[in-house]
Every structure is written in C-alpha cells, then in structure tokens.
C-alpha cells in the first residue's frame, strides 16, 4: 500500500504511521464496493430514462457524466455523518485532521482516490479509468487479493453507458448507396425501362438534356413540330387584322347567350376594330341615341336579348306578319309594321350586333377561311328545327335577324313606330359593311360571306317558322325590307338566277318584282353574277339618315353608298 501513501503525499496529504492503511484495507474495500453498488443503481436509473427518451439521440451521450459526478462531489458532503470513521481516520493518518477539518465517510483510500483524480483534470467520466489503473497499480503491492477484486467491480460500471449507443443501428453508407448503380437512380429524367452504358450513366442531367436535344428521337421530333405549328397558328391569328381566328374563332361557343356576352365584351384587337368602334360611336352621337352610359346600354341589351329569347313574339304574330307581307308583296306600303319586330332585339344594342353579325356571316360553310365551322353552322341552322311549335326556331329566327345585314337595312323613315329602332338598324348595317371592307381583301371577303344554297334554305325555313310543304317559300323572306325589291340597279335576270340557285321554286309573282331583295342574301351577293368588283368602287354621296322617306331608287343608291365608308 506504499503506492497509496505516495499518491496522497503528492496531493499534499501527510500520512502518519504506516500500519494505518494495512489495518483499514478491508474497510476501504467494503466502502468501495458500496460505492460501486450505488453507481450501478444510478446507471440503471439512467438506462430507464434513456430508454424512454430514445427518440432524442442527442441525450444518449449525456448519461455517462452524472454517475461520475457524485463520487468527487459527494465525498465531502457525506463526511459529517459518520463520526466513528473519523477516529479511525485520525488513528490511521495523523495529518488528515488539519488537511481535511471535517470527518469523512471513507477512510484514507478515498482521499487517495481523490488524489489520483486531482492530478489529471479531465471530465468526470474518466473517473472510472484512473480507479481501475489505481487498483491495478496497487495490485503490485503486498495485498494483491484485496486490490485485485475491486478492479473487476470498478471496471464493470463503464461498460453499460456504451450499450445505449449500441442500441442505435449504425448505417452502412456503402450498402445504402449501392442503389446508385441501378437504373432507378436515373428515374428523374429518363424511363426506367431503358438500359444505359456506363458513359451514359456518368452524364450530368444538363449534359444528358443537351445530348437528347441535339439527337432527338422521332417522337420528340413529332412533338416539336406539332408545338411549332400551334405556336405559328397563335402568332398568325394574333397578327392578322380582324381575322376569323382573332376576333371570331376564339369566341365561338355553343350557346347564343355566350356569343352575345362575348360580343358585348368585345376586345379591340387592332386599328380596324378601333375605327369600326369609332364609327359606331359617331353614328350613335349623330342620332342622339347613345346618350346613356355604356354600362346602361349593355345592361339594357342583355335584358332585351334575354326577353327576346324567351319568346316575346309568338308564332301567331309571325303568321300574322307573314300574311301581311303576302298582301304587301304586290303593292309596297310603308314598312312601319315590320320594324317593331326587330326592335326587341335591337333597341338596346348600340354596337354589339355588328360583331355578332360578322361572326354569323362568316360561319357559312362556303367560307374560304374556316370550313371547320360547319359544325357550328349545322348546330345553329339544322333543318330539323322547322316546326312552328319549337322554341329553337324562334332563337334561330332571332339569330338570323341579327346575322343577315338585309334585315338591318330597313329605311330610316320618320314614322312613329320606327323612331327608336331604325337608327340602330341602319347604323348597324353601315358599320357591318365598313367592317367587312376595312378588313382588306374585299372580293374574297365578300364571297366568303355568301351562304351556300343549302344553308340559305335552312335560314329561310328557320325565319318563316313553317315547313316548306305547307306554304310557299316566298313567305320565308317576310322580314326583308320591301324597299330593296324595287332596286333599279338589280336586273330581273340576276334575281331569277340567284333565286333558282337557292333551290326554292320561283312563284309567278317573281316576274313582276325583283326577288333578289327577298332572297335573304347579304348585299355582297351582288358580286356573284358577273361583276366581281364590289360596289364600293362607285363614288356616291353619303346620305344623312335623318331625312323624310325617299323613292326606291334613292334608297338603293344610299344602300350602295354605305359600302364606300369602310374603304378609307
């Protein structure tokens, strides 16, 4: 036990007689064993806490320090509790009294343990290792048995704390990263079914994209071509002035209400549309008609359209008007009775009719621009909706009345019943003509606006609201202004030829009066029969719309003069 005395002396503790440590060696061993048991209990408690807090791995490294902390700090407060040990300590080493004034629970070996810890100032966890080394050093002393048993007991406590870390499974990064060699590693930018060479696997995503874009597959080439085609379509439709795609095709819909709402919220695409809108506003100011705000007019137009769609004019009224027109066909009275029929649909529409009429006129199957509109045309003018009992006939008649410019070409007389509606109708017809010519390429546009005979027959049936077998087809054109009939500019042969082209049998009355005006064709149809030039080339004076009724020849010249307005 000389090593213990040497260790104590190095710490400043003077040992007295040499026989003291030999007598108290067994007591020291017992005390140390009790201390080891206490440490084991603390370790068990810490293990239970660590098991409960296993979810927080940062706590796994904390358990070792607390068990080591009590021995150095606990030896001094535990001292005053055992006065009998103090006498043994005083007898064993007389110098312990002045160095440690209080009485200690452990005799001289415990201070020697503290002395060994005082030399290397390390973490408290190192407490166990110097203890084992201390007893190993003491094993060379005169009592190997007493010194040899504690090392096993003292070395046992340090083993449990690492077991907490052993419970955590270590991740083998090499085995986990082995999946990088598989094809699934490249699932982000390539199909997993394709196999690659090692050089292809080593490519970065950017290099891979560059390689694929430089060497496209047939599928990618086809996709690229289709995308370019779509982009070109969108670009050309956006660039062309008032082309069917930009102003019409994008606004096609299956319901009439949608068409009207789109036309009311029409967007000005280019300069031509701006000019058309400016003309409309100028005419409305000239007639003192559009004095109200744009919001009120749009609201009234939507209300009038909705009321018109619900069938404000019954079938009996249509039949009555058609009978009147049959009588009026021989002697042409003033057209006052007809004008109120158009007024429910035109009273509150300052400008939306123009674009809807353009849209409807270009939907004909004979259009040179978009034959794909046949579906829309068949949907609107189907020959199945010809019985007088069905509501679609009424909406077809309303749509036809808005789409065909002849119906909006009634003279602006100063009759009482036409004070409201006639300015709108004449203005709409004029702006329709100007919009057609302002778009450019007049002849092709005129021909594209002429409906085919079959479609014209459908239109005639839908306006008349009766089957062909019941009445003569001539009544189908009851809503066309009779002033156009007596047009001196239209030879009778032209009217007969055009009317025979429509597939409708010509009655005997056709020989006495011009039928061209009754055939429900738009005015551009004059270019079919020999004169391919539009009538806008003839310079004629523009007439004011606020004049008393004129003879038929002056009205026809006024009608042709409207064509000149859109050519500026």
Curated annotation (Swiss-Prot):
The keyword Methyltransferase does not apply. Keywords: Coiled coil, Cytoplasm, Cytoskeleton, Methylation, Phosphoprotein. The modification Phosphoserine is found at residue 243. Residues 235-245, 385-395 have a biased composition (Polar residues). Expressed in embryonic stem cells. Expressed in brain. The modification Asymmetric dimethylarginine is found at residues 471, 543. It is found in: Cytoplasm, Cytoskeleton. Its main location: cytoplasm. Residues 1-22, 59-92, 139-162, 235-256, 291-403 are annotated as: Disordered. Residues 21-56 form a coiled coil. GO terms for biological process: cytoplasmic microtubule organization; microtubule nucleation; positive regulation of microtubule polymerization. Residues 139-149 have a biased composition (Gly residues). Residues 75-92, 246-255, 291-307, 366-384 have a biased composition (Low complexity). InterPro entries: Slain (IPR026179). Residues 316-329 have a biased composition (Acidic residues). Residues 62-74 have a biased composition (Pro residues). Signal peptide: none annotated. GO terms for cellular component: cytoplasm; cytoskeleton. The keyword Lipid biosynthesis does not apply. Interacts with MAPRE1, MAPRE2, MAPRE3 and CKAP5. Interacts with ZDHHC17 (via ANK repeats). Microtubule plus-end tracking protein that might be involved in the regulation of cytoplasmic microtubule dynamics, microtubule organization and microtubule elongation. Belongs to the SLAIN motif-containing family. This is SLAIN motif-containing protein 1. The gene is SLAIN1.
